[in-house]
Amino acid sequence: MGAILGKKIGMTRLYNNKREAVPCTVIQAGPCFVAQVKSTEKDGYDAYQLGFGERDEKKVTKPLAGHYKKAGKTPGYLLSEVSKSLIAGELEAGATVAVDVFTEGEIVDVLGVTKGKGFAGVVKRHNFGGGSRTHGQSDRLRAPGSVGGSSDPSRTFKGTRMAGRMGGENKTVRNLEIVKVMPESNLIVVKGAVPGPKNSYVKIVSTTK
């Protein structure tokens, strides 16, 4: 069991014992620090607030800078909470969480923010089939078609799939296998793809499902 914050480096391939190429994602996982310890008595639940990365103190608000100062740390780039049950032992504010909380072969969930695609049409965003390519039609190839009824219901239903902003959403990819752990360089290699572009921040937690 473990939990850590990290940065997506990119994708590569490794070869297994059957000489098969396995697509993998390389993640710089930690080292993280405990910015705050939350308890049931004080906060209503048990959790560790982890910090990752470094940020110029001028670029954080004074309350946030003071929050880091309580833990004896310089401002981090990312703050995120993880359940105490995911990390063995009792940690105090300022303690370090390294990549060695995970082992090779462990199954994890990776949380991140998907790549932003901007404003996208219905064919790209919702996989619509588009209009017919025949009978002389010329400009409706990627059009959405009708979005509502005539006199009944006389409105467009809420939630109707239309063009709009695509991507940039929180996403969890579950049940990825850790192929390799490299404590000396703070790297984890997981089988498969994880959300987001290169250099985006992710959270890795042991799977609970």
Curated annotation (Swiss-Prot):
Any Pfam family matching the protein: Ribosomal_L3
One GO BP: translation
SUPFAM superfamilies: Translation proteins (SSF50447)
Keywords per UniProt: Ribonucleoprotein, Ribosomal protein, RNA-binding, rRNA-binding
rRNA-binding found in the keyword field: yes
Region of interest called Disordered, as start-end residue ranges on this chain: 128-166
Single GO molecular function: structural constituent of ribosome
Domain of life, per lineage: Bacteria
Known partners and oligomeric status: Part of the 50S ribosomal subunit. Forms a cluster with proteins L14 and L19.
PANTHER family (UniProt xref): 50S RIBOSOMAL PROTEIN L3 (PTHR11229), LARGE RIBOSOMAL SUBUNIT PROTEIN UL3C (PTHR11229:SF16)
NCBIfam families to which the protein is assigned, alphabetical: L3_bact
Function in brief: One of the primary rRNA binding proteins, it binds directly near the 3'-end of the 23S rRNA, where it nucleates assembly of the 50S subunit.
Family stated for the protein in its record: Belongs to the universal ribosomal protein uL3 family.
Protein name listed in UniProt: Large ribosomal subunit protein uL3
Species, as recorded: Chlorobaculum parvum (strain DSM 263 / NCIMB 8327) (Chlorobium vibrioforme subsp. thiosulfatophilum)
Primary gene name: rplC
